[in-house]
Amino acid sequence: MGIIVREMRGWWKSLRLAVLLVVGLLLPLGPGGQTAAPAPPALLLGTAWYPEQWPASRWDADLALMQQAGVRMVRVGEFAWSRMEPSEGQYDLDWLDRAVAAAAKRGIYTVVGTPSAAPPAWLTQKYPETLLIDEKGLRAEHGNRQQFNFDNPKYRELARKMAEQMAKRFGHNSWVLGWQIDNEYSDVSFDAGTKADFQQWLKARYGTLDNLNARWTTAYWSETYFDWNQIPIQTGYGNPGLLLSWMRFVSDTWRSYQKNQLEVIRANCDSRQFITTNMMGWFAGYDHYTVAKDLDLASWDDYIGQGHLDAAENGATHDLTRGFKGKNFWVMETQPGAVNWQKINNSLDKGEVRAMAWHDVGHGADAVSYWQWRSALNGQEEYHGTLLGADGTPAPLYDEVKQVGAEFAKAGPVLAGTSPKSEVAILHSYDSRWAIDWQKHNANYDPKEEIISYYRPLRAIAQSIDIVPATAALGGYKLVVAPGLNVLSDEAAKNLIEYVRNGGHLVMGQRTAMKNEDNGLQTERQPGPLADLLGGRVEQYYALLETVPVQGKFGAGKGRLWAELLSAKAADVEVLERYGKSNGWLDGQPAAITRAVGKGRITYIGAWLDDAGMKAAAAWMTEISGVRPAFGPVPYGVEVSARYGGRGTVYILENFANGADGGAACGDDGCAGRRDEAVGDFGGIRRGGAFGSPLRAGWGANPGIYKDRRGF
């Protein structure tokens, strides 16, 4: 019997080997002979990897350390043009092909970056016209990045050829998930060619000089133009219509610059490969909605810089990015510890990088990628945080990222197909932010901070916020808030009026609808085309040297930086707040008014309220709008994020209280008295236990990932 068993075991071993060989032969092979990739994880941990900076003999050691840390994606190539095309027309992508294949052997996917952010020396030497000209008329030189002219035809031609070569090589590689075009669009050129193209853009937009002169009111200061080539480029201070037109031209030019490469990539790659570019949060150098139109995926670079994670500030940036495409996004770069470009480059606290990662995911990130993997031995960013030191051994942060990788692998299947959604939207407009920045009227007025001042209390109550443009579809929101929507186009005005008439609640903040779409003053008092619906208007605005007292429905508090004297013109308008004794003009006058319009409502808040006032205002507007929290009451400092879809609802809870007393903790009955199924025992949270039992102090010490049982 023993012999038979041995024979049977030998037979089974031979059969298993034969089956494996047959399966191996039948599996499709990708370029370079590697096995075709399986479907990528729903939640990816990644890093920026620069194989061109290191000998090929070191690659696998790096990739092995990535694999051990749970890194499943690398971004490569975005600064390697000189290696890929060492001289004009002589392309060398073999080394990059080998790097992609080496990553694949470790089960690591790749995002390929086109290298146009850093042109090679031969290019800028041979074609100096491809270098940008700054506002002072100085031409950039080689030795940095982003020194190219984004409007130059020759540069676009060479960048397109490079992108085409890359797409032909990697467009059908199943281990390549997608493409990043360029890197962090930012610097523009003020050369003669760009100026001429701007003038042609104006001609296409306005048609005639008479129309342009009328809409810009160029009779002011004798600015009238008699020829298109008389129109200058102005930034910062100048005719408001000209300034806004220049920024719109810049946005369109970045879009066409991007499309120049995007077209050849799309023509040569599989439809499953996405195309993105890495944006920079609240950076206002161009209109991100315009640039995002042609992309498959929005992504951004999440850097805290100096200081520490502010959950509301960072969360708003995630929600802004999610709004560029109206769906989940990627964090293409984030800091592993510290940066190198602030006045004080403090490192993030232990646990803070992990807290950031889960915070990203809660707000809709499907990938979190660290910049960068290993310190370069030289270069401008030697001091920037990395996962490996220059010696090639793990930095102290490596183990924390490894923990994130393990958690992502565990939670990914549950988060698959889920995304945030909200009953509350905040409207955001680049036109409006630019317009206010050019004419602040109070040097301390920051339009981004105005948005955050509304976002912070609203997010705490609703536990989910969308940030969208004023032209977005608004029908699914119970509450829409428009802080500082200074420039209001006819299209946006029509959209907002329709939203209110269909039963929504629109809340406007100060400075709303002062300007038309040419950045000129509206012919009606604020809020311009929305005044009739409001049944009231702004009689006068005041930049504030001191705070002013405000009292009413939102309690007693202060108005800061800006206050507007409101008046009610319709009998059914309710005054919510009034000013106290201040400058005489505002004394006793309405500071906030509201009006029911059929099943809808429209509200105007004319003062930038202090924190307590904003919190009370947020509570009032959410209650009267019927907004429900995504999850339910939680202790102070606990942030809830909800992702819907897939097989149900997934909640992510993090404790940001970070106080000496341990901050918040949920009781035995759980937060909001709820018990649901824990997805993972992350940081001591018990599987199947109450939410966050306990939520310890520290940077997201115990991020709780939970499934709503009702949805499964």
Residue ranges and their predicted role:
Residues 4-19:
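Bacterial N-terminal signal peptides that target proteins for export
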Residues 16-28:
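Bacterial N-terminal signal peptides
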Residues 45-55, 79-94, 141-160, 182-189, ...:
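The substrate-binding groove and active-site-proximal loops of carbohydrate-active enzymes
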Residues 47, 66, 74, 103, ...:
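Conserved, mostly hydrophobic/aromatic
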Residues 53-68, 159-165, 280-291, 349-357, ...:
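Short, acidic/polar
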Residues 60-67, 72-140, 164-167, 261-269, ...:
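Aromatic-lined substrate-binding rim segments of carbohydrate-active enzymes
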Residues 136-297, 301-314:
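Polysaccharide-binding and catalytic clefts of secreted carbohydrate-active enzymes
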Residues 271, 281, 292, 303-712:
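Carbohydrate-binding surfaces of carbohydrate-active enzymes
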